[in-house]
Amino acid sequence: SALVEILGSVGTVEQLISHPAGSVVTLCANRPSAEWYFADGFTGADSIEQIVLTNPFSDATVVDISFVTSETERTPANLQGFVIPPQSVITLSMDEQGARNEPVLAVSVRASSGMLIAGRSQHYLGQGRLGYSMSLGASALSTQWSFPDGEKVDGNSEQLVIYNPTKIDRSLSVVFINGSDSANSLEPAVVTAPAGRVTLLNTANIPGLPAGYYGIVISTNDLVDEGGVVVEQVVNRRIGNSVGTSVLLGAPTGAASTVWSAPSGVSAGLADSLVVLNATPVEGFVTVSQVGPAGTVALSGLESIPVPASGVVVVAVPAGLPQSEIVIQSTVQVVVQRLLSRGNDLVGRAAVLALPHLPSPDVGK
């Protein structure tokens, strides 16, 4: 792990990982938390899942770790009151904690003393998943999660993994957003997420879901308390006998913004470099710019791209663009996701959100 401190100003940081099973970009935490959650986990076909626990402080952090499989919730005795020494990193291989060959594996990390940062490293080796991913956990539950890049495409499979670590069953609405008028829009799917369990929603089973791209917004219907759930999206993109798996933690409540940054840039030349979700009832306009020696300059042809109300737009970033920070500005609050090349001529995409500027700035049309 690395700690980056920016003195006298503000900045954006993310991590680029090169792996033989696929390169990925992962967001960095801007603060520690006393709790971390991972909805999706997978050790099927001897796939490797590791939870990475970082304590950047000069005092020890004490945590309780539990996990949920398709059959039960487990709280291993050796992971209760687990001590993370000061200024240290500990990696837990989930197969060594009694979770080998599990197709469903959600993890909770709760600190009883101190705070920490928790991430997840995944190397998928079979049972429909191949590739590598690295991501932060969710540092809090949320009553809403948004995903810009829903895909119903030949060869792809898409699954929403919902983890409810609370003691109360949750009723959820799953809304699919594709810019259709009210006459053609889909009714929200209603899903019950039982307390302490993982719920899987295969979007291929949603009746009437049209082919193509759509956004997804998952919200809790009950107002019992301020708790919520954690939701991740798993997409397997298949070409022939090859598969590329991506896992994305959604954007939580309050993450929509008019300005988003991608510090490490995008994969230029892809037809689906960026996907922008506009969940508002108002049409917006998006401009994609690059940061360089001359400052922030709009990319030719990517000025004022219309984004339909309650819709998504897929943006192709031109080939030949040098790798540097990209800034996405919108006249309405949006959620922005990047789809990145996995490198090594591997099929599929790596998926990661851009970074929202919060509170959301005012951006003129």
Model-derived features: positions:
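Solenoidal tandem-repeat scaffolds enriched in leucines and small polar residues
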Residues: F67, E73-V153
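Conserved functional hotspot residues at active sites or interaction interfaces
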Residues: V10-P56, M115-P165, D225-P281, S289, ...
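Intrinsically disordered, low-complexity Pro/Gly/Ser/Thr-rich segments with frequent PxxP/GP/PP motifs
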Residues: S1-L3, T72-E102, A106, D181-A211, ...
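Beta-strand-rich extracellular modules
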Residues: L7, R110-G114, S219-L223, T331-Q333
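C-terminal beta-sandwich/jelly-roll accessory domains of carbohydrate-active enzymes
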Residues: D222-L223, E283, Q290-V313, G320-V352
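Extended non-catalytic domains of envelope/secretory-pathway proteins
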Residues: T91-A106, S133-A140, D149-N164, V175, ...
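Extracellular/secretory-pathway and virion-surface proteins
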Residues: L3-V4, E35, V327, G364
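Short acidic, flexible loop segments centered on an aromatic residue
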Residues: L53-T75, A111, Q159-S182, S273-T296
